[in-house]
């Protein structure tokens, strides 16, 4: 049987929609793309296991070789939705133009599996003494369901892991976490001519905002990591809505905010800080303030700066590692083994109309992956 080419695999990945979204009208599941990956890696001699994590949501683990340790190459099989009407090309067809691949998932990050496939296809596996694993997860763009499930249930313990998010082939050794909450204030509506008739939720929210701003200052003073461009945790007030009319006492007000904690700040500790900041306001207004997570929190992540794995990958790439402010599945896979984020394409193209990956990344990415396989599986 003739094996598909790099371009065949790339086209197949992009043409197989696998959008995940908290909006049910967009959410599709990833079964079709997982089935294609299963066929392709099985044809290369990998042992493939597919796990249904939730209905319609699948993880794939492909294994080449036996033994302890080895290398895990990981990525997510889902994409974000796309902005209808704002793309110059069909987002679900791979378009080659101006020395770039255009399409949804070209950079973030289904296309990475085509690079793994091509590197594995070219590899001479004689002398392999440690396994190579390929992990394709579900729902990274929403809940990180696939990575959470894999790290909690896999019996395998690779020596090292590379996640192929778009980093322009610069190794990433750490990133901040992400916590997003809703604060809901329930007041009591009434006619604005007599404030005593109600409880104004906006006025209570004003006290909540003051407490959160004090917490933001505390986080900046107490936590600092010079390895990050923004060296302290950030707290952002992202969305607020309250009331419905100028002549009514506001009965409900809702705030969405997020915090991006540094590595080393525990999620439980951060939650205690957040709730402690609002303790006085809640005591003043019992039963009127509710805090609800927008999604499962994601911890910060950092691979130990002087770890030999970092130095090894820096040598392969010819560039020093760095830290970033966006999130990946690394905090969960790091629970299994030292983990770095390294992949083709730029994060600047992620989640954008006309997402693309430049042809300039093709040969260097295959080369780096081939060298990593050779270094950690032979």
From Swiss-Prot:
**According to its UniProt record, which cofactors does this protein need?**
Zn(2+); Co(2+); glutathione
Q: Which UniProt keywords apply?
A: Amino-acid biosynthesis, Arginine biosynthesis, Cobalt, Cytoplasm, Hydrolase, Metal-binding, Zinc
Q: How is its cofactor bound, per UniProt?
A: Binds 2 Zn(2+) or Co(2+) ions per subunit.
Annotated compartments: Cytoplasm
A GO cellular component term found in this entry reads: cytoplasm
Give the quaternary structure. Answer: Homodimer.
Record protein name field: Acetylornithine deacetylase
User: What is the organism of origin for this protein?
Assistant: Vibrio vulnificus (strain YJ016)
